[in-house]
Amino acid sequence: MESISWNTPSVRDALAAVKRDAPFVYGLTNYVAANLSANVLLAVGAAPAIGAAADWPARFGAGANALWINTAALMSSGADTLLTAARAASKAGTRWVLDPVALGAGAPEYDAIVRDLLALRPTVIRGNASELIALAGGTAAGKGVDTTASPESALAFIGDLARRSGAVVAVSGPTDYVTDGVATLAVAGGDARLTRVTGAGCALGALIAALLAQRGAALAAASAAHAIYATAAERAADARGTASFAVRFVDELSLLDPAESSRDRSAGQIGAKRRE
């Protein structure tokens, strides 16, 4: 299995392309995560629009450079809103990310909507181990939005899900794994305090969408997003508390320089991380 990091040239190239092109990224996410998601996109140079104002799902689902749908958007939007955006994206060829938050946690009507979205062929599916095991048809029950399984235990499931859905599938944890059903890439690093920042995992879906907008290989885009996220978290690791870490994390995302030399600044210490 190949590992990638901030020092992988393709990762830096992916971020440079976002900074150069400022892709328009449309998102449907929950109100808890919307602010951080928008700030993450702005920090890397993307142009976000988030929410379900009149006509946005159909118009922006088709017209944005990329779309991401976090299914916890159902907290404030109806299922038709999410399905409209996904259908518009699929029809227009807009690449999109599905984040099936809390799938398998014991809400059958909610889970059915997620599966309806899956049928619309997302480009990338990202989530924690419990969510993705459940989406692949396995038995896994998360603790609300949090995982009770390790990413390693999900590897066989995400490979199968990728092959059946045609999507790249990414599971997050202390080490992230991203697969297209044939090749699997590993991304280590980050900081455990991402698990204490509301919406950190949701915002990762937004970042994946920004990199997908560049139209390169989806596997490379999704894995690069994880590596960029991990690096910013590592560089924020000396923040004193959780709130200062959250602010510093966005700062570090904005300061990442694709042209920097590996000698200019260490990519940080490898550590445990992330809202899984």
Swiss-Prot record:
MF annotations from Gene Ontology: ATP binding; hydroxyethylthiazole kinase activity; magnesium ion binding
Bilayer-crossing regions: none
Catalytic activity as recorded in UniProt: 5-(2-hydroxyethyl)-4-methylthiazole + ATP = 4-methyl-5-(2-phosphooxyethyl)-thiazole + ADP + H(+)
Binding site for ATP: R126, S172
Keyword Kinase: yes
Keyword Ligase found: no
Pathway stated in the Swiss-Prot or TrEMBL entry: Cofactor biosynthesis; thiamine diphosphate biosynthesis; 4-methyl-5-(2-phosphoethyl)-thiazole from 5-(2-hydroxyethyl)-4-methylthiazole: step 1/1
EC top class named in words: transferase
Residues that coordinate or bind substrate: G199
EC number(s) per entry: 2.7.1.50
Cofactor: Mg(2+)
UniProt entry keywords in alphabetical sequence: ATP-binding, Kinase, Magnesium, Metal-binding, Nucleotide-binding, Thiamine biosynthesis, Transferase
GO biological process: thiamine biosynthetic process; thiamine diphosphate biosynthetic process
InterPro entries the record matches: Hyethyz_kinase, Ribokinase-like
Range of residues in the leader sequence: none
Biological role stated in the UniProt entry: Catalyzes the phosphorylation of the hydroxyl group of 4-methyl-5-beta-hydroxyethylthiazole (THZ).
UniProt family annotation: Belongs to the Thz kinase family.
Record-given protein name: Hydroxyethylthiazole kinase
Species name: Burkholderia pseudomallei (strain K96243)
